[in-house]
Design a protein with these regions (language model features):
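Intein/HINT protein-splicing elements and their conserved insertion hotspots or analogous self-processing inserts
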Residues: 342-371
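Short beta-alpha connecting loops at secondary-structure transitions
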Residues: 34-37, 236, 254-258, 310-320
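Flexible loop/turn segments at secondary-structure boundaries
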Residues: 5-9, 35-43, 70-77, 236-240, ...
Length: 371
C-alpha cells in the first residue's frame, strides 16, 4: 500500500523507483491504488502518468496500480474506520480492541484529544483521502431514529437551529434529548462528529464514498494498460468495507459498454495479471488446469452491489463481517475440472480435500510472458 508513503515525497520516490533498474533487478510491484477521489477531481490522472513513467524505456519498470471496480464506499462505527488512521488523534482509538468501548471513551474524554481531533479535521493542507464534507457522510444506524438515513450535514443544521432557540427543530423527545446534550454553541463541524463518537461509539454506524463515483472515469482507469483491476480489500476489514464482488463488477462495467469490452475484461482479470506475476494460469491452453467460472449475464446486468451488502456472523472470526451476496450471478465454479459450486450450494469436496494448486512463478512459458 502506498497511502502512507505519500506523506513523505522522498520515500514516495524511492519506493516507486525500486520497480525499475536504477536499484538493480526491478521489483515487480502492484501498488494500491489508482482512485478518482470524490474531493479531489484531478488526482486520478496522476496514477496512469506515474505508472507510464515507471514502465517507460527510461526506467524499465515492472509496475502497475490496482483499481477498485466500484464506488469506494466505506463504513464507520463511531471512529472505528481505516480512514481515521490518517489522523494522529484517532489512531489512538484504532489501537484499542474493537470491543473495548470504555478505553475509547477514556481517550475521547480528554481535552487534549478533542483539541487535536478538531484541529486535524479542519486542517485544509493535510494530505488525506477523507472527504470531510458533512453532507457526504450518511448515517445508517443510530439510537436517534430520526437521524437514520440522514447526513451529518442535516443533523448539524438541525442542531444549529435548535441551539438558536428553535426547540421545534426536535422531532421527538429522543431527538430533543440528543440535541440538548451537545456543547452549546457547537462551534466547528468537527465538534459534531467528536460529540457523536463520544456519546454513541459503535452504536453510530455511518458511511461515505471515498472515490470512484464517476462511471466514465472509473472505466478509463479499469482498462488503462498500466493499471489492473484489483484492490478488493475486504479480507483485511471486518465491518468497514466489502468488495468481494469486485471482479464481477469489472465485468459489469464492461458489459455496459459492449461484448468486446467484456472479452477484454476477462483478459484483464485472468491472463494479464498472470503474465505480470509470472504464474502459469489465466490462459485457454490445451492441457491447462480447467479453472472455470460461469456467470449469468442477465443476472450480472441487474446486480446492485450496494443493495447486496450484508452483515453476517462468521464463526471463523467469532464476529460479524460485512460481506457481499451476489446470489444468482455466478451459476457454477470448477477447480481443475471439478464442480465446487452449482449456483446454490458448495460441493462437499470443497475445503475437505485438495482441489487446486499453489500458483508459483518460474515455468519457462511464464518467464517468457513476464519478461
Amino acid at each position: 500500500s502506498t497511502a502512507i508513503l505519500i506523506l513523505s515525497y522522498l520515500k514516495f520516490l524511492r519506493f516507486f523507483l525500486t520497480s525499475g533498474r536504477l536499484f538493480g533487478r526491478p521489483l515487480r510491484t502492484s501498488a494500491l491504488t489508482a482512485v478518482d477521489l470524490t474531493h479531489e477531481r484531478r488526482t486520478w490522472k496522476l496514477f496512469p502518468a506515474i505508472a507510464g513513467l515507471l514502465n517507460s524505456r527510461l526506467v524499465d519498470g515492472r509496475f502497475h496500480f490496482q483499481v477498485l471496480a466500484t464506488p469506494f464506499r466505506m463504513y464507520a462505527e463511531g471512529m472505528i474506520c481505516p480512514i481515521f488512521e490518517e489522523f494522529a488523534s484517532s489512531r489512538q482509538l484504532m489501537a484499542c480492541d474493537i470491543e473495548d468501548a470504555a478505553a475509547r471513551r477514556r481517550i475521547m474524554a480528554t481535552g487534549a484529544f478533542g483539541e487535536l481531533f478538531v484541529r486535524e479535521w479542519h486542517d485544509a493542507g493535510a494530505v488525506s483521502t477523507f472527504n470531510r464534507d458533512l453532507d457526504a457522510l450518511h448515517i445508517e444506524r443510530c439510537p436517534v431514529a430520526e437521524w437514520c438515513g440522514e447526513t451529518f450535514g442535516a443533523v448539524y443544521r438541525r442542531l444549529r437551529a435548535y441551539q438558536a432557540g428553535g426547540a421545534a427543530a426536535a422531532r421527538s423527545p429522543a431527538e430533543a434529548e440528543a440535541l440538548a446534550s451537545f456543547p452549546d454553541p457547537i462551534g466547528h463541524e468537527g465538534a459534531l462528529l467528536l460529540h457523536l463518537a463520544r456519546r454513541y461509539d459503535r452504536d453510530l454506524r455511518w458511511w461515505f464514498t471515498v472515490a470512484n463515483d464517476r462511471p466514465e472515469v472509473l472505466e478509463q482507469l479499469l482498462f488503462h494498460p498500466h493499471l489492473l483491476p484489483g484492490f478488493n480489500d475486504s479480507g483485511a476489514h471486518l465491518i468497514n468495507l466489502a468488495f468481494f464482488d469486485g471482479n464481477l463488477l469489472t465485468l459489469q462495467v464492461a458489459q455496459r459498454r459492449s461484448l468486446e469490452r467484456v472479452a477484454h475484461a476477462v483478459q484483464r482479470l485472468t491472463r494479464e495479471p498472470a503474465e505480470f506475476f509470472g504464474v502459469d494460469a489465466g490462459r485457454l491452453d490445451a492441457g491447462a488446469q480447467a479453472d472455470i467460472v460461469l456467470v449469468d449475464p442477465e443476472a450480472l446486468r441487474c446486480y446492485d452491489t450496494d443493495a447486496n451488502r450484508r452483515m453476517v456472523y462468521r464463526d471463523i472470526f467469532e464476529h460479524e463481517q460485512l460481506v457481499n451476496r451476489s446470489d444468482g450471478v455466478v451459476t457454477a465454479v470448477f477447480i481443475a475440472g471439478e464442480q465446487v459450486w452449482d449456483g446454490r450450494e458448495f460441493a462437499r469436496a470443497l475445503g475437505t480435500r485438495r482441489l487446486g494448486r499453489p500458483l508459483t512463478a518460474g515455468t519457462a512459458a511464464t518467464r517468457r510472458a513476464a519478461a
